[in-house]
Amino acid sequence: AARTLEATPELRVILNHTGLPWDRSSAGLEQWRQGMRALAENPGVTVKLSELGSPMAAWDEAANVAILAEAIEIIGPDRCVFASNFPVTGLNASYADWLAMVERAIALVAPEARQAILHDNAVRCYRLDISEPAS
């Protein structure tokens, strides 16, 4: 994917599910890191911090927080957006628990970016006009 994006650097891409790191073995996570680093080279890539369930590994909250934190570090907090993937994520965690996990990851690596990751980046990436609050 990263090589394809090199040919179209103006293309904006929003990567779902934190790059989907299903294989949680050391080799699998290293492959995920390499892919994420390659995608990080393209400024048009934004990562949705969502859904870390894996058919290959049991739900592990601490491991998921670490993956979220690493994704934020690799891509940069200005190119990450919060997402939930509910109702699917609800198979493993409540919405409140998922939000708390993402907030813990943000606090580990970019506490100053909480507002950006949870709100501002999505407004920018999706070009939302929300100058007026919903009534």
What are these regions (language model features)?
Residues 1-81, 134-135:
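Catalytic pocket-lining loop regions of alpha/beta-barrel enzymes
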Residues 17, 47, 85, 114, ...:
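Divalent metal-coordination and catalytic microenvironments
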Residues 20-22, 87, 124:
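Residue-level detector of flexible, active-site-proximal loop/helix-junction positions
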Residues 31-35, 59, 63, 86, ...:
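Tryptophan-centric aromatic hotspots in well-structured domains and transmembrane helices
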Residues 52-54, 86-89:
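Short Gly/Pro-enriched loop/turn and capping motifs at secondary-structure junctions
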Residues 69-70, 74-81, 90-135:
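Mid-to-C-terminal alpha-helical segments outside catalytic/metal-binding sites
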